[in-house]
Amino acid sequence: MRYWLVMPAAGVGRRFGNTKPKQYAPLQGRTVIEWALAPFLADPSCAGVSISLAADDPYWAEVAGRLAKLDGRVPEIIRAGGGVERSHSVRKGLAALGTRAAAEDWVLVHDAARPCLSPNDLQHLLERLRTHPVGGLLATPAADTLKRASTEPEPSKDLTRSTAQPRSSAEPRRAAEPRSSAETRTGDNPSLASHPNADPQVAQTVDRSGLWRALTPQMFRYEILCDALDRSIAAGRMPTDEAQALEWVGEHPVLVQGSAANIKITSADDLVLAAALLNARETAAVTR
């Protein structure tokens, strides 16, 4: 079987806190996006790659130059435009494939910020969905206890009650002093005055039974995915992943269990973890 890879890479990664977008952060001698591409570029079943990039992306040319020097067969890499939302970028990446992709061809969509996809997980996904009419995605069952955060502010606490000295019955009551405008805004809640960005409270514990964490790649038939995204965008609904677009049109993508090591880079700390995972994989390969 053959498949096409679409990689949305137009994001700027505001949470990452770096001058470069996270997909171009250095990682173990390469960039994050090069690691994300590696399993696909090494797979003979990958017919081509469509990467959605920001119009003013100044970093891709250097990466593309290194990829062009790779030994062996490297599938064609097509540059597509990026969009405001992920769904727009994916749709532009699909459109850039043009007549290369047939209606029933498989398309895999993979995050540019997931550098730790293992070749084994990729092959497992391909084998599991090879004959499926719609497709599915790599995912992992939720293992942690899940908490829903409250949207309500923390209840006010009168911190003066425990420290104030009792007033005798003979002591006259003093008139209240006028409060400044700042004191009026924060009211009588010292915690809000001191901690305007207070941590949220727990509203409830969510039953994790049946809950899975969606990963990528997500694998769907070309025509079905294009149609689902077109209908979602036309309705003003912006799916956070491709599977959600399929859900909205009545499909039920398959959850294919993958490795929790297939992490997404969202902060600088994640780069440390990704480096450790890649090192461990390389060490395991050498010792086999």
PLM feature spans:
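N-terminal glycine-rich phosphate-binding loop and ensuing alpha1 helix
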Residues: 1-58
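Conserved N-terminal catalytic core of the sugar/cofactor nucleotidyltransferase
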Residues: 34-104
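Conserved active-site beta-strand element of glycosyltransferases/polysaccharide synthases
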Residues: 253-257, 263-266
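Short aromatic/hydrophobic "clamp" motif used to bind/position activated sugar donors
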Residues: 107
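Hydrophobic helical membrane-anchoring modules
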Residues: 262-288
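Residue-level signal for inorganic ion chemistry
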Residues: 7, 33, 93, 110-111, ...
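Conserved core of the sugar-phosphate nucleotidyltransferase
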Residues: 117-168, 172-179, 183-254, 288
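Short, conserved active-site loop motifs that form the nucleotide-linked donor/cofactor pocket
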Residues: 3, 74-77, 211
